[in-house]
């Protein structure tokens, strides 16, 4: 199936074509027709499955085809500023030819720029709960005309203690609305919240990306931030690294790294959302033709890249969303070719590495024989193997379908056995102490 077969309007198809999207992911294929009909949706899907486009594209289309009344018509609530920014960047791409305007608001930064954006008028508001409630209480936001509400990563919202904020938001928005509810997991608390928010929803479940390609050799280098560029230049002296795709978290970081490499006479170009379509296409063509040895990309830009035969992928900065790692390294080793994925990890990125290894269920081999290795990194990596093995073992115990209850039943059984094991150990320890 193609996006054209989903009955999308021409301005959106044009934007998707420029982004490089041709084929919808499973969740997009299932969700877009449902949402275009105006139905509520309950989606069990993780970040990395394409769920942002699954709700953003139909929202943009319905707003484009509406009567264009003023005011905020769609609210997307997210747990973190990083996710809010990422969703905002997606809207930049998909809504570019529609005139549908959006704003992103989150805490931890001054309010003025966000308030100014709201005053200019937006139809879509992407927000974290705290800043949304702050600005609403100050009279900067009115949600009375809201028609669409998206709650993203609901389980993470609960983990972070946002349940009361969500309840406050629900009191501020109209009861008659289309509601989209996404969660990576569906424990009883989430099901209860979903039931209170949704009306006869369509239910969609998408298996998350959790395994990496077999033909890819992975490794991690522990290195401090200020020495990453030196390590990269050291590695690029190896002529076997013929064609390399490097990932950064920010557009500024991509541009800066391209300048560093070009200054060292290593042909490099950056590709990201601030580049014009012609500039992105030129950089991509140069990389495919091997005119340029290094292509540096942000994750948003990389989703539109179709390159099959680069030898190496380098995570210059680890992604803060673990599923993104799987998508990044999946771009090497395509079409039966062996790929090599190298990751740089500074001390502040250790939590990201831990999440990545938990997701893929293995310990990424550490390269220690380089001049910039950090002792802190080696210590943090030590002792993780058994933990990951146990995690993988537990996953196998309760693997099954979430929709028919097998997954949750087996998970509960596994957790019960683990709890009994801990109680037995406690009793033995107590006996020894007595």
Regions of interest found by a model, annotated:
Residues 2-377:
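Conserved helicase RecA-like core
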Residues 289, 359, 363-434:
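Basic Arg/Gly/Lys-rich low-complexity intrinsically disordered segments
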């Amino acid at each position: 199936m193609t996006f054209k077969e989903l009955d999308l309007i021409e301005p959106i198809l044009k934007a998707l074509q420029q982004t490089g999207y041709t084929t919808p992911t499973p969740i997009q294929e299932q969700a877009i027709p449902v949402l275009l009909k105006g139905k509520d949706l309950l989606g069990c899907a993780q970040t990395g499955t394409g769920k942002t486009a699954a709700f953003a594209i139909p929202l943009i289309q319905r707003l484009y085809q509406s009567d264009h009344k003023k005011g905020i018509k769609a609210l997307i609530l997210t747990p973190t500023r990083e996710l809010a920014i990422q969703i905002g960047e997606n809207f930049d791409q998909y809504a570019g030819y529609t005139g549908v305007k959006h704003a992103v608001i989150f805490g931890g930064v001054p309010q003025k720029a966000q308030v100014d954006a709201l005053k200019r008028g937006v139809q879509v508001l992407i927000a974290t709960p705290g800043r949304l409630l702050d600005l609403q209480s100050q009279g900067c936001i009115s949600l009375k005309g809201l028609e669409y509400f998206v709650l993203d990563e609901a389980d993470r919202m609960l983990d972070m203690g946002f349940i009361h904020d969500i309840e406050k938001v629900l009191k501020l928005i109209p009861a008659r609305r289309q509601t989209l509810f996404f969660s990576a997991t569906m424990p009883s608390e989430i099901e209860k919240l979903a039931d209170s928010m949704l009306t006869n929803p369509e239910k969609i479940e998408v298996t998350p990306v959790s395994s990496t390609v077999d033909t890819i050799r992975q490794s991690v280098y522990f290195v401090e931030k200020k020495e990453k560029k030196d390590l990269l230049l050291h590695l690029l002296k190896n002529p076997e690294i013929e064609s390399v795709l490097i990932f950064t978290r920010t557009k500024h970081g991509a541009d800066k790294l391209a300048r560093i490499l070009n200054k060292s006479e290593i042909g490099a170009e950056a590709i990201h959302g601030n580049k014009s379509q012609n500039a992105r296409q030129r950089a991509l063509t140069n990389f495919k033709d091997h005119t340029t040895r290094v292509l540096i990309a942000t994750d948003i830009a990389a989703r539109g890249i179709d390159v099959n035969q680069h030898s190496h992928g380098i995570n210059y900065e680890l992604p803060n969303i673990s599923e993104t790692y799987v998508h990044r390294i999946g771009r090497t080793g395509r079409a039966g070719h062996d790929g090599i994925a190298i990751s740089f990890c500074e001390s502040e990125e250790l939590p990201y590495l831990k999440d990545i290894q938990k997701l893929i269920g293995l310990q990424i081999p550490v390269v220690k024989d380089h001049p910039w290795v950090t002792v802190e990194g080696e210590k943090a990596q030590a002792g993780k193997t058994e933990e990951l093995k146990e995690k993988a073992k537990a996953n196998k115990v309760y693997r099954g379908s979430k929709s028919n209850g097998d997954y949750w039943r087996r998970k509960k059984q596994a957790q019960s056995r683990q709890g009994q094991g801990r109680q037995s150990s406690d009793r033995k320890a107590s006996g020894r102490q007595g």
